[in-house]
Amino acid sequence: MYLYGASGHCKVVIDSIESSTSKKIEGIFDDNINLKKILNIPIFKYQTFDKQRIKELFICVGNNSVRKLISENIKANYGTVIHANACISKYASINEGTAVLANAVVNASAKIGKHCIINTGAIVEHDCELEDFVHISPNASLAGNVKIGEGSHIGIGAQIIQGISIGKWVTIGAGTVVIRDVPDNSLFVGNPAREIKK
């Protein structure tokens, strides 16, 4: 397996892979020519990327829009990364390119899209539906039947009550408590959540 993006998030992905699988990480591609290694994994210039020899790839980029752009520009066999200490229901579905990190919970009948991040200690309860490129930050909690639109970012420790719909490319600030639906392309913060004009 190869990784793309030599960031702090990459370190967490490496740790998750090593915790839960015998897959060997062959290297990391990045456009920062000054980086040589991360956690003893060699870093290669993006210009040397050859998709013909890459059997499996994973994008280690926290920024949702950048992750989407990379996935659209690089057609590859994308794997999933699931930490050994994540708790995932056998009735949940998780699509390619998604990471579920340490102590995260994905419960029964939850559906997780492509290239999502379910970060450390995050909770995705029963029947939630996450579209592609969503990031659920550490210790954020989604109650049952929550829907999250493409590219949305749910901040650290945010809480979303049951049955709420969050639009596409929304930002929910850290610690925010969401008790009503949120429209596309908006920024909400506070308890209860209120909209901030971008």
What function would you assign to each model-found segment?
Residues 1-2, 25-26, 53-58, 168:
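Short active-site oxyanion
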Residues 1-17:
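Glycine-rich adenosine-cofactor-binding loop
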Residues 9, 34, 194:
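Conserved Rossmann-like nucleotide-cofactor binding loop
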Residues 34-89:
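Phosphate-bearing ligand-interacting subdomains
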Residues 14-16, 69-73, 112, 183-184:
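Short amphipathic alpha-helical segments
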Residues 81-189, 193-196:
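Structural signal for interior beta-strand "rungs" in well-ordered beta-sheet cores
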Residues 20-37:
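NAD(P)-binding Rossmann-fold cofactor-contacting core
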Residues 3-4, 29, 60, 101, ...:
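Short hydrophobic segments within beta-strands
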